[in-house]
UniProtKB/Swiss-Prot annotation:
Name of the protein this chain belongs to: Large ribosomal subunit protein bL36
MF terms (GO), sorted A to Z: structural constituent of ribosome
The family this protein is said to belong to: Belongs to the bacterial ribosomal protein bL36 family.
SUPFAM superfamilies in the cross-refs: Ribosomal protein L36 (SSF57840)
Cellular component terms per the entry's GO annotation: cytoplasm; ribonucleoprotein complex; ribosome
Pfam families reported in the protein's UniProt record: Ribosomal_L36
GO BP, one annotated term: translation
InterPro entries, per database record: Ribosomal_bL36, Ribosomal_bL36_sp
Keywords: Ribonucleoprotein, Ribosomal protein
Entry annotated with the keyword Phosphoprotein: no
Amino acid sequence: MKVQASVKKICGSCKVVRRKGRVHIICTAEPRHKQRQG
């Protein structure tokens, strides 16, 4: 999980999810694409 100030989709499988006021990127195809804003 990368924690970054600015998160963006890396591939077509990445999805933007809001959890507890934070923005997360989840990816089913490539788990290394997981990110959290903050």
